[in-house]
Structure formats: C-alpha cells, structure tokens
Amino acid sequence: MPDNRQPRNRQPRIRSGNEPRSAPAMEPDGRGAWAHSRAALDRLEKLLRCSRCTNILREPVCLGGCEHIFCSNCVSDCIGTGCPVCYTPAWIQDLKINRQLDSMIQLCSKLRNLLHDNELSDLKEDKPRKSLFNDAGNKKNSIKMWFSPRSKKVRYVVSKASVQTQPAIKKDASAQQDSYEFVSPSPPADVSERAKKASARSGKKQKKKTLAEINQKWNLEAEKEDGEFDSKEESKQKLVSFCSQPSVISSPQINGEIDLLASGSLTESECFGSLTEVSLPLAEQIESPDTKSRNEVVTPEKVCKNYLTSKKSLPLENNGKRGHHNRLSSPISKRCRTSILSTSGDFVKQTVPSENIPLPECSSPPSCKRKVGGTSGRKNSNMSDEFISLSPGTPPSTLSSSSYRRVMSSPSAMKLLPNMAVKRNHRGETLLHIASIKGDIPSVEYLLQNGSDPNVKDHAGWTPLHEACNHGHLKVVELLLQHKALVNTTGYQNDSPLHDAAKNGHVDIVKLLLSYGASRNAVNIFGLRPVDYTDDESMKSLLLLPEKNESSSASHCSVMNTGQRRDGPLVLIGSGLSSEQQKMLSELAVILKAKKYTEFDSTVTHVVVPGDAVQSTLKCMLGILNGCWILKFEWVKACLRRKVCEQEEKYEIPEGPRRSRLNREQLLPKLFDGCYFYLWGTFKHHPKDNLIKLVTAGGGQILSRKPKPDSDVTQTINTVAYHARPDSDQRFCTQYIIYEDLCNYHPERVRQGKVWKAPSSWFIDCVMSFELLPLDS
C-alpha cells in the first residue's frame, strides 16, 4: 500500500488505475490548534443541512416516502401531501422525527462551542424547541381558526402556504391592485360593537363591498399619511383574505389581551385577527384544505358545521414513548424516543372553549378549558369572557407574569384545571409525562402545585418519575419526589425508576432515589436488579450496599395522604354478614353517599367482615387481590355513631390484607405477576371457576395446556415471579400445575425448573397472606 503521509512540498506520485483513490487530506479551517478538527466539523455540518432551507437541521423530520430530511418548520405546509424536493407522496402518519440525528446535531453544537470557544451557538441545546406548526414569524397563516359563540365550536385548518416569501408591498398607486392594507384606528371595543351588528343580520346575505368603500371604512389613506405605527405600541394582527394568500395587518391592542366571546357571530376577518400566532400542533381537529378550498371564503357557520361532521384527527407525533418491545442501549433511543411537539409564541389569552383539543405539550403551563357540546355546552351558554383559556404556546417565562397570575387566580380557571391536567394523548401520556421527558422544570412545578398526580401511568406503565430518571433530569426527579412520587413503582417489564437511572449512568439521580428509600433489590420481569445494568464502579458501590432498614423504606414509600386515597367514590360490600349487619351497612352507604354492591366488582373499595379474622370467601379473596380495605364490622359502627367516614387503619385486618393494600398504593405488580397456572383435574372445595377468577384478579394467566417440564421451550423462559422470595429457587418457577389436594388421589411430585406442581390449598394460602409461600415437599 502506498504511504499517503507525504510532506506537503512533495508532489504526490501518479495513482495507478487499479489502486483505490485515497481520501482527501483535511485542510485546516484556520490557524491555531484543532484546525483539522474544525475543518472536519464543517464538512459534517454540511451533511446535516435541511434539504429545503439548506440550514442546519432543527428537529429533523422525514416524511416517510423518501430519504430527504427537513426541518420540522420547513415541511409544515407539506404534511399529508408529498416531499417538496422529489414530490414523492407521503401520508401524514408516516411523518417521523429522527431523534438520533437530532442528538448528533446537538453534539456537533457542543463540539463547535469547544473548538471555537463560542457560547452562543445557533444549535445550543438549551434553546427551546419549536413545534411543527409554531413558526409564526415565517408562516403567520399556517393555522386558521374559526369560532362560533353560538354553537361553541372551534375549527382549525392548516394552510398550505408557499415557502417563498411574498414581495414587499409597493407604495405606489399601481401596487394597490396586488395587495391591500386595512388598518383599524378604532380600539378593540369597536370589535364587539361590530360583532353585535353582525349578529343581527347573520341570517341575511351580506352585500359585497367595493374596494374603495372598504379602504374608506378602514381609513387606509389616513393611516398612510400619518405614517407607520409606533414600534413600541403593542399590536395584534387582523387578517383579511380575498384570495389564497391573505394579507396580514396590525391594529392596536390593549393590555395584550384578546377577547373572542363577543356576542353574536364573528366575521371571518375578526376570527382570524383574534387568533393569530396561536399554535396548537396537537389539536384533534386539524385539516389541510386543498387548493380549491383555499380560494374560497368560508363563513363561520359553514366552518362550525363542518367541524361537527368532521371527526378526522391528526395523529399525534411520536413524542418520546418507549417502545414496548425494542429496547436499545442508548438512554433516549432505547425507548424509541423522538422529540416532542412543542408550542411557542407570544402569550395570548383567548376565550375559545374547545373540548376536543388535547394539550399534551408541557413546555408551557397548561391552559384552563371549558367543556362544550351537549349538556355542558348548554349550561355554559351564558358564559362571559371572564372564563379565560391560556394559549398552549405560553412559554415558561410567563409563569411569573402579572397577566398569567391574574388569569390563574380566578376560581373558574382553577376549577377547570384538573380536567385539563388529566388529558392524555394516544400513548396515555399526560402533561406531566411530557414535561418530565423534556425536563421542563417550570411546567413540572406548576402542574404539581396545581394538583397533577405524580404517580399517573401511561399505557405502557411509565410514570413521570420513570421518564425523568431515564432522561437524567435531576431537578425534575427532586420535584416529583417532594410531591409524593412513588419511588419503587414499576413500569413496563417491571422496571423501577432506579433501573432507569442505573441503565443510563445517572449517578446523582441514583443517590437521590436511594435517599428516598428506593429498593436496591427490586427486580424486573427478567430477574435483574439495578446493579446488573451498570458497569460503573462508583454506581456499583452505591447499589451493592446492604439495605439497612428495608422496612422503613417500604413505609416511607407507602405514605399517602388520606385525601389522595379517597379521591374516588366509596364502594362497599359485605362478606359473611348477618341480615342485621347488612342493614347497618346499607344505612352507612346512605350516610357516606357510597355505593353498596352485593357481588364483587373491580370498583369495590371496602370489604367488611364480621369478625377480627378474614374469611376464605370469594369476596374476601378478591378484595385482597385487588388491594381493597378489608375492615372489621366495628368500622361500620364507628362511622354510624359519628356520621362520618372514620379512618380505616384502626379497623383494618392485619397481615395479608394490609400487605395487599400497601402493594396497590405503591402501584406495584399484583401477587401472581409473571406466573402461569394450569388447573388440573376437578375441584370441589373451591370451584374451578372461582380459581380462574382468583388467578385473573391476581395478575396471573391461565394455561389451556399442561406444561411439559422436559420441554426446552418451557425451560428457556427467562422471566421471573415478582413477589417470590429473591433468595429461593421459587423465583424462577413461573408455571404451576394446581390440583385438588382434598381428594384421596395425589399426583406425582413435579418440581423441575420452571414447572412445579402445587395443591390448591397452597394457592388459597398465598392469596390470604398475599405472598408466594414456600412450596414444601
């Protein structure tokens, strides 16, 4: 092989045609140290450019039909149509954000800061992200919104505006034929007056006004003579559209507030003007009109009608959900995470009541919403503009603004906050989930202070604490733990927050979790502890320390206030009670405004037994497996004496029922999680149907075929039973053959690897004590 390391003053020899072309030498980008590295970084950044705007990619997305990669803002007008470069058709659900490429761009930004000693990079990682539709400066009309005060309906339409900017407006007379400016010198109070006049003639067809009349009404000539507006004056934008490219003009605004609840119907221009620069990327009712519909003027009545009939929603962008099956090694890509759609823009207060618009964006505090449509729409028909809804594009900096505090101090706004805070996207994520993923500390703090549940789980089982530990947001983890987040709760595949922190090497978070009582010996579905996922010696030294006071840690994790436990309705049921005791229980249900069932249901919260010991009835066992309160009948008497709901702890049956309740409050897996049962033979003492109900209620699964102990497929299953003792071989046994032991026939003993035979009495004892008891010979 030829030596390519030649001095610069020596001419390279002629390359043979059979030899491969050598790589070009890196030319230094400048003088000084790291010149070759800077040159290589420049070449890398040339490859990381958008295929449309040729700038460095920001939130890179792929339309799915081709290999071109764009900035998310550059293709907001191409969603659902096709690639703007090769014109390949692309479905809207194929839109994907390349999180790995985005991480590479952030690393390039850090490297450039190191090489150039520049702290102000345009790729700075901490710069707030922009969503797919929030570029209000470059694409002011990307989203149109219509609102009807009568029907209380809102519709959003995505405009397919051209990427090319329009030419500047000429001041000569000939330019007036192409573009027009309509400036209103009147204060915003006139808008409400015009809206009232418009409502009186909403049923009549409005006459078309000539251009001269409109110019005269809007006082265009006078404004041009007076000159430009004062740049210091706050202004809002009004949009008057005569064609597919509407003109945007400005008019004064008072206190930066926008009121849309003027009585009567609003004209198209007023609706547009009051709702500019409001970005709602996650709205369910988003349509992309075709070319024909863009050239026609749509009235609010027509829009509201279409809104009622149209139920097609825009699929939510893959906003950082971990994959349920493919778990990679990197902390972000292991859960198939992609960036979150975020909103930005100026702080706008609007009074648009919309129920079908989820707001799973947490880069900003949530907005208070009113429910509309159906009964709630009729009840709120007389609502005034004091019901304020914050824009989802509110940046965290507005948390301390006076206008924000004024809005959130209103009782109506705070009353509607919980309904909005529990909104979920199609992955089951709440606002708190996404704020924890993004590390948005102001939004997390705001949501927690206003009653958001820190222990809510998404469809995969992840809590906000899991997400914060996975992404390494130490401050978010601290906030969640301070607001009673459960430190040992399990997520997908029974991973605890400590598992996530250990996998990704977040030592500070591991220390914080351990200080709050995180269990070092917690195992996931594969039987692996947090220490099994790390190679770092310092982290191993933390995770290998013995748990000195495990009982206190468990009690620390199980602390939940009474109000949090009693959020839901009380559902009472009695087991083994006499007729007189049943009457007293019915009286208590009336006093406490609770429900009383005769058959067990998954909604039951309290099971009342006559004595001090729990009975092996089906109701009691189902109550134990579901984590219900198993109470003595003295609790009913105490509640009847004081006419209030007494504290349950003093009247709770100890041992198994208490362990079951604490297990449920800590959101831990059920008793038979990871176990499979085959019911062999006939059952007389406990019918087979009852055993099936118990297995299902305990999180186990029923096998339709008898497992074979000598089967390689059976023995190679790598899952474990969560509640089995970690120091016994029973933890690896996941398949049980249950038989009736009260009869004279006893089958041969099987205890081979994953398959064990066990009597039905052992199964019942496990339920009553809520633990997997040792299986004696």
From Swiss-Prot:
Q: List the residue ranges of the region (Interaction with BRCA1).
A: 26-119
Q: List the residue ranges of the region (Disordered).
A: 1-32, 167-211, 356-404
Q: Which reaction does it catalyse?
A: S-ubiquitinyl-[E2 ubiquitin-conjugating enzyme]-L-cysteine + [acceptor protein]-L-lysine = [E2 ubiquitin-conjugating enzyme]-L-cysteine + N(6)-ubiquitinyl-[acceptor protein]-L-lysine
PROSITE patterns on file: ANK_REP_REGION, ANK_REPEAT, BRCT, ZF_RING_1, ZF_RING_2
> Keywords assigned by UniProt?
ANK repeat, DNA damage, DNA repair, Isopeptide bond, Metal-binding, Nucleus, Phosphoprotein, Repeat, Transferase, Ubl conjugation, Ubl conjugation pathway, Zinc, Zinc-finger
Q: How is it modified after translation?
A: Processed during apoptosis. The homodimer is more susceptible to proteolytic cleavage than the BARD1/BRCA1 heterodimer.
Tell me, in one coarse class, where this protein mainly resides: nucleus
Show the cross-link location (Glycyl lysine isopeptide (Lys-Gly) (interchain with G-Cter in SUMO2)): K160, K170, K423, K548
As recorded in UniProt, its EC number(s) are 2.3.2.27
Subunit note? Homo- and heterodimer. Heterodimer (RING-type zinc finger) with BRCA1. Heterodimer (via ANK repeats and BRCT domains) with CSTF1/CSTF-50. Component of the BRCA1-A complex, at least composed of the BRCA1, BARD1, UIMC1/RAP80, ABRAXAS1, BRCC3/BRCC36, BABAM2 and BABAM1/NBA1. Interacts with UBXN1.
Its job: E3 ubiquitin-protein ligase. The BRCA1-BARD1 heterodimer specifically mediates the formation of 'Lys-6'-linked polyubiquitin chains and coordinates a diverse range of cellular pathways such as DNA damage repair, ubiquitination and transcriptional regulation to maintain genomic stability. Plays a central role in the control of the cell cycle in response to DNA damage. Acts by mediating ubiquitin E3 ligase activity that is required for its tumor suppressor function. Also forms a heterodimer with CSTF1/CSTF-50 to modulate mRNA processing and RNAP II stability by inhibiting pre-mRNA 3' cleavage.
By what name is this protein known? BRCA1-associated RING domain protein 1
Q: Which organism is it from?
A: Homo sapiens (Human)
